Amino acid sequence: MLLSCVCARLQEPFRLHIIANSDGAADQNVKLLVRDAILEYTADEASACRDKEQAEHYMREHLSELEACANQVLAENGFSYTASATLGRFPFPDRTYGGITYPAGQYDALRLVLGEGEGQNWWCVMFPPLCIV
């Protein structure tokens, strides 16, 4: 267990956080479609990043494209609201991926808020690429 904590600290994570418009079934479903589109869009680059800074730089350089990607999914599925993409430091609960535990705390992330952003959220660790593998 100690090794898990040490490994997590050695590779400071960068996260993806998507917040649905509401808890309604349609809003929750489109949140997952946005997730799939964003993970597909970033898969090659995110898995090639050597460190958190490189992953964050990629997200910063492509922030408008990532927001457009989310908005395209929303429009294609008949939603009138849009997505807002931001980079920042946000609170997250603890999470274990295999043998690596990331404790609860503030982490750097790409956050996509869909519409009002009042629904259940989905998140993962993009670097190291744990939600891509």
What function would you assign to each model-found segment?
Residues M1-C7:
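Hydrophobic membrane-insertion alpha-helices, especially the h-region
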Residues I19-N21, G115, F127:
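Solvent-exposed residues in well-ordered beta-strands and their adjoining turns
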Residues D23-G24, F90-F92, L130-I132:
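Solvent-exposed loop/turn segments at secondary-structure junctions
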Residues A8-F14, G98-Y102:
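Secretory/periplasmic and organellar redox-cofactor proteins
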Residues E12-L63:
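Early exported N-terminus immediately downstream of N-terminal targeting peptides
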Residues L33-R35, S47, I100-A104, A109, ...:
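General N-terminal targeting signals
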Residues W123-V133:
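Flexible, solvent-exposed short loops/turns enriched in glycine
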Residues E56-N121, V125:
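Mid-length scaffold segments of soluble, non-membrane domains
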